[in-house]
């Protein structure tokens, strides 16, 4: 396949991992500016398209909200399904509990404001957002359809898309209770997710 289709990680690999490392001051700023103080924030970053499974994510969040009334879902990204997802949020009477941020240039700062990260994709390769979220030391809940290579931190969980909404909700609720975030730069480097190192590794893998 052409190189342009094999290396969708350019933005991340040209940046520095320190951009995503947890920063408490940034966390407080983003949460204060966006009315998220006191909320248990579930984050998702991705284009609004079928692959990313937003409709399923809303069903899961409805179950989470039944268990935790302080839960707030924050969605970064844009795309053709955004309006349909907004309509579903209204039908579920959750429009006040779901924040649609759109495309932003400071996604790395938004990761600081999250309490956990959820990626229920129908399929993925090695998702950059999963690396970013773990760089920010976020507990992550990934679809079991995503490669296990992405789960390099001890707080990464995988749940099958055929599992019940309650199973997903309980896994997310458990993730929300982990609040001891620290600088994980050393761990990420040890797991070969240093930006420069991984860029070279992926290029060698895909361009052989």
Task: Label each residue range with its predicted role.
Residues 86-102:
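Nucleotide-activated donor-binding/catalytic signature segment of Leloir-type glycosyltransferases, i.e.
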Residues 1-11:
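Single conserved hydrophobic/aromatic residue that forms the stacking wall/gate
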Residues 139-143, 148:
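Short hydrophobic beta-strand element within catalytic cores of glycosyltransferases
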Residues 40, 44-63, 80-84:
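A conserved mid-protein helix/loop that constitutes part of the nucleotide-sugar donor-binding site
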């Amino acid at each position: 396949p052409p190189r342009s289709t094999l290396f969708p990680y350019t933005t991340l690999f040209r940046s520095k991992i320190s951009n995503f490392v947890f920063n408490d001051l940034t966390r407080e700023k983003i949460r204060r500016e966006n009315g998220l103080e006191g909320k248990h924030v579930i984050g998702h970053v991705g284009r609004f398209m079928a692959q990313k499974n937003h409709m399923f994510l809303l069903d899961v969040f409805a179950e989470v909200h039944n268990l935790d009334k302080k839960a707030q879902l924050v969605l970064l990204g844009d795309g053709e399904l955004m309006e349909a997802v907004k309509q579903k949020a209204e039908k579920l009477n959750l429009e006040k509990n779901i924040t649609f941020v759109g495309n932003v240039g400071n996604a790395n700062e938004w990761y600081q404001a999250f309490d956990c990260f959820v990626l229920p994709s129908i399929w993925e390769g090695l998702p950059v957002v999963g690396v970013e979220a773990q760089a920010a030391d976020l507990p992550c809940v990934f679809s079991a359809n995503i490669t296990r290579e992405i789960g390099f931190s001890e707080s990464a969980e995988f749940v099958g898309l055929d599992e019940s909404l309650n199973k997903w909700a309980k896994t997310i609720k458990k993730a929300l209770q982990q609040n001891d975030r620290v600088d994980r730069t050393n761990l990420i480097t040890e797991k070969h997710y240093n930006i420069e190192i991984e860029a070279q590794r992926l290029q060698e893998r895909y361009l052989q």
